[in-house]
Amino acid sequence: MEEISTDPVVPAVKPDPRTSSVGEGANRHENDDGGSGGSEIGAPDLDKDLLCPICMQIIKDAFLTACGHSFCYMCIITHLRNKSDCPCCSQHLTNNQLYPNFLLDKLLKKTSARHVSKTASPLDQFREALQRGCDVSIKEVDNLLTLLAERKRKMEQEEAERNMQILLDFLHCLRKQKVDELNEVQTDLQYIKEDINAVERHRIDLYRARDRYSVKLRMLGDDPSTRNAWPHEKNQIGFNSNSLSIRGGNFVGNYQNKKVEGKAQGSSHGLPKKDALSGSDSQSLNQSTVSMARKKRIHAQFNDLQECYLQKRRQLADQPNSKQENDKSVVRREGYSNGLADFQSVLTTFTRYSRLRVIAEIRHGDIFHSANIVSSIEFDRDDELFATAGVSRCIKVFDFSSVVNEPADMQCPIVEMSTRSKLSCLSWNKHEKNHIASSDYEGIVTVWDVTTRQSLMEYEEHEKRAWSVDFSRTEPSMLVSGSDDCKVKVWCTRQEASVINIDMKANICCVKYNPGSSNYIAVGSADHHIHYYDLRNISQPLHVFSGHKKAVSYVKFLSNNELASASTDSTLRLWDVKDNLPVRTFRGHTNEKNFVGLTVNSEYLACGSETNEVYVYHKEITRPVTSHRFGSPDMDDAEEEAGSYFISAVCWKSDSPTMLTANSQGTIKVLVLAA
C-alpha cells in the first residue's frame, strides 16, 4: 500500500462542499430616474392603465407616442436607443415622434397626492395642509402651540422618568452584584482565617513535638545505660514526628531542619563544637534554598493556586448538612478541614518538583539506522519492560532496568518484531504480561506474543489507517480500535470478527477504555469532540464533551471519573465523566498538526510539543509545572531552531515521577521529576 505521508499528522474534518451560485434574476434592475423613483405608490394599489408598460410603475414625466401610447420619458428614451419601435404595438417609432402628455402627468400627480393623503399619518396630513397654505386663525395657532407645548413637556417628563428607571435598575443590579462579591470575599476571608488558625495550631504542635524530641535525646545522651538504645528510640521518635509532618504542609522543611539540629547536638560529644555547628548550618542553608525555590514556584502560579484553594474550600460549604456535620467532626479531631487538607496535598505535590532530569537516553544513531518517528511508547503491566513502535515498521521491546542502569552502548532491545506497515499505537494487555496490541497505517490491528515474537490475532476490518488501539483493564480479552474510516471497533481475542462496530461519521484519532469498567469508552475524533459511550447501548453516546477547537488527538483516564484530552488546538483539557462537566484547560505547549503524545497519572499530565519539548502539568494548575527540551549532539542549533523535530510519544511509569519520552528523530529519553 502506498504511504502518503511519513509524519503522523492528526486528521482534520473535511468541509462539506457548498454551492454559492447566484441566479441571473437575483440582481434585478431597479428603475433609475426614468422609473417610478418619484412615486411612492405601489402598482397593485392603482389602475394598471396608469402604469408604464416598460417599468410597470406609475408613469413619471409622461410622454405620448405617435401611435397613442404613454410611457415614462426615461423608459421610452432608453428603449429607443436599442430598438426603433413601440414597445406596445411594435410600430416604427423615433425620438422625433415623442410628445409631452401634460394632462396625464397632472392627473397622475393628483392621483398620487390623493393616495398619499389616504395613507399618511395625521401629523403628515397636518403638515401637508399647512404647506398647502390652509387658512388658520391666530387663536387656533395659539391653541395648537399650547397643545404642542404640553405634549412636548409630557414627552420630556416620560423620557426623563424612563431614563431614571433604567439608571436605577442598573445601580440596583450593580449593588446586588457587588454585595454578592463582598459576601463571597467575606466568606473566603473567613475560610482563610480559620485555616490560618488551624495551621498555626498545627505549627505549634510541631514545635512542641520537636522540643520533646530534643529533650528526650538529651536525656538519653546523659544516661550511659540508655546510649545503646538510641538508634531504636530515634527511629521510633522519628516515625512519630514524621507522621505529624505529613499534616504539617509547608512547615515540614522547618521541622526537619530543627530535627537535624537536635540530632547533631545529641551526637557531637566527641566532635569539635565548630564542626557540629557548621554541618547544621550547611543543612539549614540547603533547606532555606529549597524553601525559597518552592516559594518562587508558588508566586509564579499564585492565581491558579488561589483559585484551587477557594474552589476546594467552597465545595465544603456546598455539601449537604449531614456531610458538613461529619466534616466538622473531622476539623475538631484533626484541626484541618477537608478542603484545606486537599489543597495542602495539591500545594505539596505542585511545589515538590521544578525540573525534569535525564537518567537515561537511547540515541537514534546507536540503535536505529535512520531517523524515524516513535509513534508510541508504552510500559508493560509491571513496568519492567517497555515497547516502542513507529514508522520503522518494527516493535522494539526494552528492559527498563537495563536501559537505566547499563551504559549507553549496551542499551539494545531484547525483542524485535517486524511488521508490514508503519505503526501508530501500542497497548499492553493488563493481565497477560507478554501480550501487546498494535495498530498500523493499513488499518490492521494485531495482537502479539512478545515471548514467541509471533502474532496471535490479526483484525483487518478497518478500511483505512488505524490510529489507536487499547486493551481493557477489567476484561483482558477485549480491545478497542479507531480508524480514519470513521469506525470504532471492539474486538475479542477469542474471535476473529469485531464484536461491536460504531460509525462515528468523522475520523477517529484515539480510543480509550475506562479503567474501572469495560462497558465505557472515550473516543476522540476530528470533529473536535470527545464521545463517551456505554457499549451496552451504542445508538448514541452517553455524553459528547465539547470545547476543543480542533481535532482531539488523545484521550486518557486519570481515574474512573477523570478524563484528559489533547488536541491540535495546543490545549489539554480535563473532564468529569461522572457529572459530564469540563474541569480545567491547560495551556503552554505547542501542538497544531502532529501527534505529540499524552500520558497521565493520578496527579500529573504530560505531553509533547512541536517545539521538541516535553511539558508536565499538575492536574489542578493550568500552567506547566516544568518542561524539558530535547537535544542531540548530532543536531546543530540552526536545525533545532527550525522546528524540524517534535515530541511524538510520552508515557509515565506507574505511581512514579519517571517518564519515557521519544521524539520524531527517534531519540528516547528516560526523564524523572526532580526538585
Curated annotation (Swiss-Prot):
Region named CLS (cytoplasmic localization signal): 67-177
UniProt biased composition (Polar residues): 279-290
Effect in UniProt of substituting C55S: Abolishes LAF1 ubiquitination and degradation
A cellular component term, taken from the record's GO annotations: nucleus
Remarks, miscellaneous: Plants lacking COP1 are not viable.
Function: E3 ubiquitin-protein ligase that acts as a repressor of photomorphogenesis and as an activator of etiolation in darkness. E3 ubiquitin ligases accept ubiquitin from an E2 ubiquitin-conjugating enzyme in the form of a thioester and then directly transfers the ubiquitin to targeted substrates. Represses photomorphogenesis in darkness by mediating ubiquitination and subsequent proteasomal degradation of light-induced transcription factors such as HY5, HYH and LAF1. Down-regulates MYB21, probably via ubiquitination process.
Protein name according to UniProt: E3 ubiquitin-protein ligase COP1
Organism: Arabidopsis thaliana
Gene: COP1
